Every structure is written in structure tokens, then in C-alpha cells.
Amino acid sequence: MTTFDRGEKPDIGTLVAFDHVRFVVGNAKQAAYWYCANFGFEPFAYKGLETGSRITAQHAIKQDKIVFVFESALLPDNTELGEHLVQHGDGVKDVCFEVEDLDSIVAHAKAAGATIVRDITEESDENGSVRFATLRTYGETDHTLLERKKYKGAFLPGFKPHPMPPTFFHSLPRVGLNFLDHCVGNQPDLQMAPAVEWYENILKFHRFWSVDDSMIHTEYSALRSIVVTNFEETIKMPINEPASSNKKAVSQIQEFVDYYGGSGVQHIALNTTDIITAIEALRARGCEFLSIPSSYYDNLRQRLSVSSMKIKEDMDRLQKLHILVDFDENGYLLQIFSKPCQDRPTLFLEIIQRQNHQGFGAGNFKALFESIELEQTKRGNLFYENVKDGQHK
């Protein structure tokens, strides 16, 4: 595991934070409802036929500082969204960043050779105006750079308050997720380095953390990962690629690439200050999470017994909830991973709590991989020659 220094502050504008994540889905209304019911979000903004949007419908949901937007086509000839949906299934299309000094960021991106999906545009309504531009990153994933300034609306121009009353969601256990911690992108083999270089060259990100397959492997599969971040280290983007194994198994990273149809967002990590309460609430709502064997907790207790690090949370409750623990001499983190959020084994969510620990759970990768490999076995996907027929290698 390697960590990096942030270096000098770039001489372009500031990428402030994650603003929102936009999904392309088959039915935005149903997808938004599912994430609200399962993960504790509430609908707050809407754009569709009733608001004058004739092309797509968008449902925006939020939980504290986390905002997800689900978009689907309204007309049958929308080839842009239709082709994306056929190729990738429901998934993340755009990870939007709030920025300051949009002009200088876009000017640098153009000079560095970025693909500009949409040049600087201004949109306005009665609440003010916002300016934005959209860049293409890995695969068909985009980053919209959004400059809000003094916009006073609930979300963005063109959106109106969501028509669905949140009364039902208030009757469910409160979850308590606070902000988007990091957003992970999976790449085909040998495509991690070009993706990382894109962030370094186009957005002036720096490397924050990395591991390779000598550390992260099981009997069957392995991965390599590099985390890139902005200068302020408020936006963290881990980039993964599969690594081959002696067993010739299909890594979870390769499985994602095969079913997503290329590079894309594998998972979104959501931060909480009380993961035990959050997971108890999420399980009560019907969320499904990966199962961790009891042997993991036996080993964890043994390692903690000879460490100066003390975990404040009750270990029996962590084990009952299948929450993973990683620690070093400075602090620890607690994390858990959902099962895929759609039929394709692609996007899932992570819930994470940090106690003076800025890593990404390297000590848990082996247990996590083994748990995912059990799920791959159930799907018939741990060994296959061709993803379409599932025949074993």
C-alpha cells in the first residue's frame, strides 16, 4: 500500500466537492422510489412532462449532502439514453462536481486534450442561474462541472419540488448517511493507468493511495487500485483494474466490465457517523449486504488483541451485522457492501464510517473478495470462457 503527497496547488480553479450523481435507468420514477425505500433517501426535486421537460424525466433524491438523480427517456426515439441502457443497463452516467472558476478549469481541460461533451452553458430560472460543462472520462462516464454561485433553487434550473410526499418514507427507520465518501471506477485490464493519467492531466488530481495485486488477491482473483483526488482531497476517485490469477478465475472487476460492457462506476461509498445504527436501519428496510464468515472476526479479534488500537463499537454487533473493520496505528474504518442494486452484477453501494483513518479497507479486500466470489459462484460467474453462455474455462 502506497500513499502520496498532494504537491503544489494547481493553478486552475477549484473542484470543491461531489455535487450529485446522475444515473441512466429504464424507469426513473421506480428507481428513485427503490433507493428511497431501501437506502433512506427522500425525493426532493423533479423534472418531467409536468415541468415542461419533453425529452427525459429526472427524479432527484437526497439524504443530507448526498444527491442522486435518476433519468429515463420519455420518447421511444431517444437513441442516446436507449443505447446507453441497452449497453450498460441501469448505472451511473455522470458524477457531477461542484467547482469554482469553471472557465479556467475548462480552458485547461481543452488544452490538455479532454473530450468536451458539452461546452460551458448557462441555464436560468426564477431562482437564478448556474453554469456548467461536461467532460468525458473513462468509458461512457461523464463529469459535469457545475458552478452554482448564488443559485437559490432547491436543486437546478428546470427542476420543481418533487410531487411525491415523503410521508411514507418518514415511517421507516432513519438511516443517517451524510455525504459521498468516494466513487469507484472499474477498468478493463491495463486500462487503470490511462484513466488515472486522465485525472492527473485533465483535472490536475493527484495520487492519494494505491495497492497492487501482490497485496490484494485471493486464491482465485486479484486487483490493482489507484485512488486519485483533488488538491483539497474532498473528491476521491479510486480506479480499479483486474489482475490475472493462477486459477484463471473471473475477477469481480472483470465480471463488472463484462456485464457493464466496459469501464464504469462500480460502487459509490456513502459516509455515516454511526454505521451500526445505519446498517440496522438499512437491513430493516430490506437492504441486502454481503455476508462475512465468522473466521474473519476470529482473526480480527486476535489482531486487535495485540494492537494498541481500540475499537469503540461492540464487536459482537459488528459481527452480527457483517460489518468489516480495517485499522492501523492511527485509527480505523468500518465498512459494508451491498449486493448489486440491479439484476446485472454491476453497481453496488458501500457504507463507511471513518475514525481517523483515510484508507480504503485494504486489510478487508481479501475477505471482501472471498465474499463476492461466493456470490459469483451462485451466479455461475467465477469461471467462464464466454459471459453469454457461462461455460467454464
Curated annotation (Swiss-Prot):
Residue ranges of domain VOC in the record: 17-148, 179-339
Q: From the UniProt record, give one GO term of the biological process aspect.
A: L-phenylalanine catabolic process
Protein's UniProt keywords contain Metal-binding: yes
Task: State its cofactor.
Answer: Fe cation
The cofactor binding remark recorded in the entry reads: Binds 1 Fe cation per subunit.
* E.C. number: 1.13.11.27
Q: Looking at the keywords, is Metal-binding present? A: yes
- Which keywords accompany this UniProt record? Dioxygenase, Iron, Metal-binding, Oxidoreductase, Phenylalanine catabolism, Repeat, Tyrosine catabolism
Tree of life domain:
Eukaryota
EC primary class? oxidoreductase
Instruction: Give the reactions, separated by semicolons, that this protein catalyses.
Output: 3-(4-hydroxyphenyl)pyruvate + O2 = homogentisate + CO2
Which pathway does UniProt place it in?
Answer: Amino-acid degradation; L-phenylalanine degradation; acetoacetate and fumarate from L-phenylalanine: step 3/6
Write down the InterPro entries for this protein, in alphabetical order. 4OHPhenylPyrv_dOase, 4OHPhenylPyrv_dOase_C, 4OHPhenylPyrv_dOase_N, Glyas_Bleomycin-R_OHBP_Dase, Glyas_Fos-R_dOase_dom, VOC
Cited function: Key enzyme in the degradation of tyrosine.
Q: Which family does it belong to?
A: Belongs to the 4HPPD family.
Protein's UniProt name: 4-hydroxyphenylpyruvate dioxygenase
The record lists the organism as Caenorhabditis briggsae
Q: What is the lineage of its organism?
A: Eukaryota, Metazoa, Ecdysozoa, Nematoda, Chromadorea
Gene encoding the protein: hpd-1
